[in-house]
Amino acid sequence: MLIVINHHYISNKEFEKGIYPITPKFFEDEVKKLSSRFKIISLAEIKEAIKNVEHADYCLITFDDGLKEQYEIAFKIAQKHKIPIAFFVNSKQYEDNELLTVHKFQLIRTVKNSKEILDYLSQINGVNDKLKNINLKDIILQYRYDDLEMAKVKYLINFLLPKDMADYIINKMFKEIFGNTIKATDYYMSIDNIQELAILGYIGAHGHSHNPVSTNDYTDIKKNIDFLNKLTPKRIEHFSYPYGSSSAISSEAIIYAKKMGIQYAYSMNRDINEKNINLMKINRFDVNDLSKNEKLKNIIERGE
């Protein structure tokens, strides 16, 4: 079998709400446990792992978004334990020299609760109509670990509002709260970091601006891959879908990603990978599933 486990924030910093990093100790303990149960593989080894998936147990450890703390903490822990690791990075932040909308929104949520954000959004024309048409099933599937009101807010911003409207609203809120105090250079990996990881074969693509690829803006995929191909010694072949649920992935986007040279793409469909694996929709767990998904817990702890 093959399991893939994804992560985002890693630090000892604590937020009251909105962002819930794993600690360095948690990740190191996770690495030890996974290493004792699986062969930890690199992106370059995924082809061989899939070929032998019915005869051996493999694990790929991934991080999305290319955050600076991932390089400074997660990569160093992986080096310490002599295991490979994978980082899927965006690229618009290097072009604009500011935080991506998705990360501005996450930081807003550390100081504003769901009601405060909904009240703010409700003042914008057309937002209330969008809220009425939200599909609860899609929300729960995408944001299973959020309360319903926050899940609605996140789904509205990330999927339902036109991108320019969502960007405008979030940028306005972010500016009002944080001003210019948070720099992109302090938040994301540097170009040197990416190049160092790319030489090791640890870099994949994650979309230029972190938009869902179901929005039909396939230039977001192209810009990201073109950007990374200029930095890496080998062409980018691995892609992590932003948000990763079935509603965030279109068949047209898969076709386009293949045309751009992507051979393996990773969803957030929480399941193991066994036989008949769809190479463009490889299943992936979230790190939260280590404690909350009974199937995954049984596999890791009891080898079932």
In which residue ranges do the predicted regions lie?
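Metal-dependent polysaccharide deacetylase catalytic core of the NodB/CE4 family, i.e.
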Residues: 5, 10-11, 81-247, 282
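Short, flexible loop segments at the rims of nucleotide/cofactor-binding pockets, characterized by
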Residues: 19, 63-65, 180-185
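C-terminal active-site subregion of NodB/CE4 polysaccharide deacetylases
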Residues: 1-62, 69, 100, 106, ...
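Generic enzyme active-site microenvironment
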Residues: 62-63, 204
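Short active-site segment of divalent metal-dependent hydrolases/proteases
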Residues: 67-68, 209
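Membrane-embedded segments
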Residues: 70-74
